[in-house]
């Protein structure tokens, strides 16, 4: 986002001043360079760290069966799609995965996208435009917000989980088409949206409901089928977006919906039409990933156990975990500098937990986003808890 660049002159010195300003406000972002696969223990710059910052919730990103399936897919399909899905880039592997995803999520059709960001952009811009209305939770993922702005529909945002305000907005809207957009599991808070109530409002006010289940797919519901299965709800109004690089362990995203919605996306979603298809070997590997997700009840049970343990370990701290029953456990410090200080203190102890600051989260809510994986052990969580308590004492 370039909002805070508005007052900066279009010169190299202007950009340097902007970057200095970000550093002064404890908002500068840095990248880590991993030298190992994703796992509870990773190597960065030659040092091993215990990591709590990946979205690899089921520990599949380095699973031997997925690695074998990926190699098998590369042998069968090569390493690149070569062109877009609508030219000659749509392979049998893509097609089989779309059919499997539709069946797994209990929708008539599914459509692959390269990323969740592109999937959300494709859906919102294909289905809405000038004269239409989009309604979104203020804590939605940036991709949903950007998609709504790109569509040129009127965007109304409601306070987090404030369905009374959403209902007033829906009731007052004269738009010909209405679309409610929401995270199913909020990526920085870890809480789950009240999907039955959201759906009821969409039914009452004749709106579509786009759910971004990037952090629920594979984790929630029977066999990991996601947030809809968690609540046991379905409706032709629902447009379901799931990602394939988090719990699924590989890469990509998909949209599942009614036949007419999917066909409209194929015809009109620019982020689907005007891009090269993902390598087909990824889709081949993801077919195996779906099998592992469906059979991963033990992994999901372990996640629940680790989540309960982490809450116990963090209970004595001055900082509080936000209420969340998902693997996303945010420990809120408030000030940017303090979140960075605690993150760095953990790093000195060989533990990686990312500090999340504005604009990713609202001002005054900087936090550590602790992310659990079923690959973590009980001892890993206890080590993190002990380190946090020691840092807490040292900062008194």
UniProtKB/Swiss-Prot annotation:
Keyword tags: Biotin biosynthesis, Pyridoxal phosphate, Transferase
Amino acids binding pyridoxal 5'-phosphate: 116-117, 187, 215, 243
Highest taxon in the source lineage: Bacteria
Class in the EC hierarchy, top level: transferase
Segments forming a coiled coil: none
Pathway: Cofactor biosynthesis; biotin biosynthesis
Residues modified to N6-(pyridoxal phosphate)lysine: 246
GO biological process, one term: biotin biosynthetic process
SUPFAM superfamilies in the cross-refs: PLP-dependent transferases
Catalysed reactions, semicolon-separated: 6-carboxyhexanoyl-[ACP] + L-alanine + H(+) = (8S)-8-amino-7-oxononanoate + holo-[ACP] + CO2
Necessary cofactors: pyridoxal 5'-phosphate
Annotated PANTHER family: 8-AMINO-7-OXONONANOATE SYNTHASE, CLASS II AMINOTRANSFERASE/8-AMINO-7-OXONONANOATE SYNTHASE
Protein name as catalogued: 8-amino-7-oxononanoate synthase
Gene this chain is encoded by: bioF
């Amino acid at each position: 986002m370039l909002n805070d660049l508005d007052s900066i002159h279009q010169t190299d010195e202007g950009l340097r001043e902007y970057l200095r300003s970000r550093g002064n406000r404890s908002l500068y972002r840095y990248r880590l360079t991993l030298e190992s696969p994703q796992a509870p223990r990773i190597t960065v710059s030659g040092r091993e760290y215990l990591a709590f910052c990946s979205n690899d919730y089921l520990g599949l990103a380095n699973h031997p069966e997925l690695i074998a399936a990926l190699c098998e897919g590369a042998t069968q399909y090569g390493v690149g799609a070569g062109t877009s899905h609508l030219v000659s880039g749509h392979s049998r592997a893509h097609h089989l995965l779309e059919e499997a995803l539709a069946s797994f999520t209990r929708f008539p059709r599914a459509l692959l996208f390269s990323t969740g960001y592109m999937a959300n952009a494709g859906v919102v811009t294909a289905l809405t435009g000038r004269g239409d209305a989009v309604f979104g939770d203020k804590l939605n993922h940036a991709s949903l917000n950007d998609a709504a702005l790109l569509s040129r529909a009127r965007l109304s945002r409601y306070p987090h989980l404030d369905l009374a305000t959403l209902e007033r907005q829906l009731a007052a809207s004269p738009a010909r088409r209405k679309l409610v957009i929401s995270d199913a599991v909020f990526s920085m808070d870890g809480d789950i949206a009240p999907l039955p109530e959201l759906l009821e409002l969409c039914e009452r006010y004749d709106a579509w409901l786009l759910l971004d289940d990037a952090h629920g797919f594979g984790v929630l519901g029977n066999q990991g089928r996601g947030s809809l299965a968690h609540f046991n709800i379905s409706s032709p109004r629902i447009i379901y977006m799931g990602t394939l690089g988090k719990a699924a362990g590989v890469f990509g995203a998909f949209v599942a919906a009614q036949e007419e919605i999917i066909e409209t996306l194929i015809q009109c979603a620019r982020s689907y039409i005007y891009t090269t298809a993902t390598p087909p070997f990824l889709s081949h590997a993801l077919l195996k990933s779906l099998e592992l997700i469906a059979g991963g009840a033990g992994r999901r049970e372990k996640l629940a156990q680790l989540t309960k343990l982490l809450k116990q370990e963090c209970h004595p701290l001055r900082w509080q975990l936000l209420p969340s029953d998902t693997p996303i456990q945010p420990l809120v410090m408030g000030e940017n500098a303090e979140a960075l200080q605690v993150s760095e203190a953990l790093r000195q102890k060989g533990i990686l937990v990312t500090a999340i600051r504005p604009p990713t989260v609202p001002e005054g809510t900087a936090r550590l986003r602790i992310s659990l994986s079923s690959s973590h052990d009980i001892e890993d969580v206890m080590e993190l808890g002990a380190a946090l308590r020691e840092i807490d004492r040292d900062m008194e």
